[in-house]
Regions:
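N-terminal secretory/targeting leader peptides
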Residues: 24-116, 128, 132-251
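Bacterial N-terminal signal peptides that target proteins for export
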Residues: 1-12
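Short intrinsically disordered, low-complexity coil segments enriched in acidic
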Residues: 1-2, 16, 141
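Sec/Tat signal peptide C-region and signal peptidase I cleavage site
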Residues: 16-23
Length: 251
C-alpha cells in the first residue's frame, strides 16, 4: 500500500505539471473525511500537495481540510467537488449509492487481491469501461484499499454462521448486501460514524481494512479480528481522488 501511495504522489502531480501557464498563485481547496493522521492525508495528500507547490514554483497551493472541516457529510463530497464548493476531494465511491454503478463491480466479495494489483485493475477499468461514471469530474487518481477484514467488539468469528444476527457495519450498499448474505444484520454508515456506533451498541462490529483502524481508534473498541484465507480478500472499495472539471480546465 505504501508503494502504491508513493506512485500516486508522483503520478498525480504530473497532472499539474503539464499545465503551462498561471496567473499568480492559485489556491485549491482539498476536502476529505478522514482525520489528518490517516494515511490518505498524511502519506498521500500532504506530500502530494507539497510536491505540487514546489514543482509549480509556488504558483499552485493546495489547502488541506480533513475530517469534513468545510461542512457536510462524507456522501456529499462528490457533489461538493462537482459543484465547485471545493476544488479537490478524496472519498469512497460507494458512499453515494447508484452514482457510480460501474465501480460497484469492484466491491463484489472475494474479488480483491493486493491493494496494488486491484488498484491497477481499477485504473484500467476506469480508462476502458467506467469512464462514463466519472464524466463530470477531472479524475486525478482511483485506487482500492487492501482487502477488508471483520472486526468485532467481543465475539470471535470463525465461520459465516458466527455472524448470524450480529449487527455489522458495512460501508456501501454492495457490501451491506454481502453482510446480509452471510447472515448478519447490516448497518450502513461511513467510517467516521463507526466509533460512536460501536460505543453506543448500535453495531456489534464492522468490516474495514487494517490501515484505517488507528486513524479512527477502532482498534481500541474491538477485540476480535478475522481475515479470509486464500489469495482473494473479503472485499474492497474504490477510492476517488477527484477535481472540479472547470477548475482544472481554468488553470
Amino acid at each position: 500500500m505504501k508503494l502504491f501511495l508513493r506512485f500516486l504522489v508522483a503520478s498525480a502531480s504530473v497532472l499539474f505539471l503539464s499545465i503551462s501557464a498561471y496567473a499568480g498563485e492559485v489556491v485549491l481547496k482539498f476536502h476529505s473525511f478522514p482525520p489528518m493522521p490517516a494515511n490518505s492525508n498524511a502519506k498521500f495528500v500532504k506530500p502530494w500537495s507539497e510536491k505540487v507547490l514546489a514543482e509549480s514554483n509556488g504558483e499552485i497551493k493546495v489547502e488541506i481540510y480533513p475530517a469534513m472541516q468545510l461542512g457536510g457529510k462524507p456522501p456529499q463530497l462528490v457533489d461538493q467537488v462537482r459543484d465547485g464548493v471545493v476544488d479537490i476531494v478524496w472519498t469512497v465511491a460507494g458512499y453515494t449509492p447508484g452514482r457510480f454503478p460501474h465501480l460497484e463491480a469492484f466491491e463484489l466479495p472475494f474479488m480483491p487481491a493486493s491493494a496494488e494489483a486491484t488498484s491497477q485493475a481499477l485504473q484500467e477499468y476506469v480508462d476502458t469501461v467506467a469512464a462514463s461514471d466519472l464524466k463530470d469530474y477531472k479524475v486525478l487518481a482511483v485506487f482500492c484499499h487492501a482487502p477488508g477484514k471483520i472486526h468485532t467488539k467481543e465475539k470471535v468469528i470463525k465461520s459465516a454462521a458466527d455472524l448470524n444476527g450480529m449487527k455489522m457495519r458495512g460501508p456501501t450498499r454492495v457490501i451491506t448486501k454481502m453482510l446480509e448474505g452471510l447472515g448478519a444484520t447490516p448497518v450502513g454508515m461511513p467510517v467516521p460514524a463507526v466509533a460512536g456506533a460501536l460505543s453506543k451498541g448500535v453495531i456489534d462490529g464492522m468490516v474495514v481494512p487494517w490501515e484505517i483502524m488507528p486513524s479512527f481508534k477502532l482498534h481500541e473498541l474491538t477485540k476480535a479480528h478475522t481475515t479470509v484465507s486464500g489469495s482473494r480478500g473479503l472485499y474492497t472499495t474504490p477510492f476517488l481522488f477527484l477535481m472540479n472539471k472547470a477548475k482544472y480546465e481554468s488553470l
